Amino acid sequence: MAESKEARDQEMNLKEESKEEKRRNDWWKKDPQGPLESDQWCRVLRQSLPEEKIPSQTCIARRHLGPGPTQHTPSRRDRWIRGQILQTEVLQERLEWRIRGVQQAAKELGEVNRGIWRELYFREDQRGDFSAWGGYQRAQERLWGEQSSPRVLRPGDSKRRRKHL
């Protein structure tokens, strides 16, 4: 008789263990939630974006309003306020995502510009800096009153008229 009791205890233990394992395997499922605390609303409604340091006006308004209807049927004014707050939260999230997009584009633009300047500096290191050459040439022409290199074609004079010379 003692053996049968032990066997039953072992079966019960196995059942409890399997239930616990099932619970452990369900860790990804959401726990059934009661009414949320008023501070939790901001985090829950915008889980995709991290909570900003300074709470926005909308978050402050929601905290002031408190959690959803728990004991009573809300009045029309209460429902309207809640609707407006939801709408502002949606707009706020859209705005934040837009800001993120602009920041991302600015970052990419900065990277491209840095790449361009890196290549320019590399070219300058390889071939030397000729950016001031045109100014130097013009200064020489002004000083001496003649073109420094008449072989270079200007838009005004073509080689055609000098061909027979």
Swiss-Prot record:
UniProt record, GO biological process: mRNA transport
A Gene Ontology cellular-component term: viral envelope
Compositional bias of kind Basic and acidic residues: 1-32
Protein name, per record: Protein Rev
Keyword Transcription: no
Cellular location(s): Host nucleus, Host nucleolus; Host cytoplasm
UniProt GO molecular function: RNA binding; structural molecule activity
Region (Disordered): 1-36, 56-77, 146-165
Species: Equine infectious anemia virus (strain Wyoming) (EIAV)
Complexes and interactors: Homomultimer; when bound to the RRE. Multimeric assembly is essential for activity.
Lineage, highest ranks first: Viruses, Riboviria, Pararnavirae, Artverviricota, Revtraviricetes
